[in-house]
A protein has these predicted regions:
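Short, charged/polar "capping" segments at the starts of alpha-helices
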Residues: 36-37, 52-58, 196-199
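Glycine-rich phosphate-binding loop plus the immediately following alpha-helix
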Residues: 81-95, 122-167, 223
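Conserved phosphate-binding catalytic cores of ATP/NTP-utilizing and phosphoryl-transfer enzymes
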Residues: 1-2, 70-101, 217-226
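Adenine-nucleotide phosphate-binding core of ATP-dependent small-molecule kinases
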Residues: 153-187, 194
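Short glycine-rich phosphate-binding loop at a beta-alpha junction
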Residues: 41-52, 62, 185-194
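Gly/Thr-rich phosphate-binding beta-strand-loop-beta motif of the actin/hexokinase/Hsp70
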Residues: 1-25, 98-121, 137
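A short, well-structured beta->alpha microelement
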Residues: 21-40
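Conserved phosphate-binding/catalytic loops in two-lobed NTP-binding clefts
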Residues: 60-72, 203-221
């Protein structure tokens, strides 16, 4: 770990930070219009981006791009966040059975990325994420409003409109993951802002799920330090 080196991932809706607090890192998020967090020096900031860049003086030479990530069969058009997540999953996951890795990044979108035990990208899927689905219903319908709280009901069929929206969206995301995940052949790793919410629901039915919310940020640190 190098003194005063911090990390930033510019997401689609938020800024994701890893602040160097030796010997560990502090992971947190801010809105794009917020000021730079205290103790973050932009000159020593390693960054990557999948969203619109904020009005910050980010140094081009400090940028990590998809082309910088050494993975087999990695297309240049893949998001750098997906590439970094794959890189870190390969590093941290114990995989003696040589299963394939399925990474579910639960953010603005739910992106699924599958790779072999040897680190070769197979491909993936992308669908609207938890909040994106809720907000799209509010935007494109007359009478639906996005819930302010995200307590997923246990029942399958609800009377309350907000509960019905929450259950429908959570089921849609779990359905995408369940249809793509074969526990006999795959290891499922969940990351991103909504990974603990969706992952906890999946874990009620399947035990062999790894939830690592900061997988991508840890991947940035790993890439830089190696």
């Amino acid at each position: 770990m190098i003194d005063d080196i911090n990390f930033l991932l510019v997401g689609n809706s938020r800024l994701h930070w890893a602040e160097n607090l030796q010997p560990k890192y502090k992971f947190f998020h801010t809105q794009k219009n917020n000021n730079v967090p205290q103790n973050i020096n932009l000159n020593n900031l390693i960054w990557a981006s999948v969203g619109k860049l904020p009005d910050l003086s980010l140094k081009k030479e400090n940028r990590i791009s998809t082309q910088d990530i050494k993975l087999k069969n990695l297309p240049n058009h893949f998001g750098v966040d997906r590439a970094l997540g794959c890189l870190e999953a390969l590093r941290i996951i114990e995989n003696p059975s040589r299963k394939e890795l399925l990474i579910a990044d639960c953010g603005t979108t739910l992106s699924l990325t599958k790779l072999t035990a040897q680190g070769s990208i197979i491909g993936g899927q992308i669908t609207p994420g938890f909040l994106t689905q809720l907000r799209s219903m509010e935007k494109y319908t007359k009478n639906l409003e996005a819930p302010k709280k995200y307590d997923i009901p246990l029942q399958d069929f609800l009377i309350n409109t907000e509960d019905s929206m929450l259950k429908g969206v959570s089921n849609s995301l779990m359905g995408v993951i369940n249809l793509s995940f074969n526990p006999t052949k795959d290891i499922l790793i969940m990351c991103g802002g909504d990974s603990e919410l969706i992952g906890s629901l999946l874990k009620q039915k399947k035990e062999e799920i790894i939830i690592a919310p900061n997988l991508v940020m840890q991947g940035m640190i790993t890439h830089f330090n190696h």
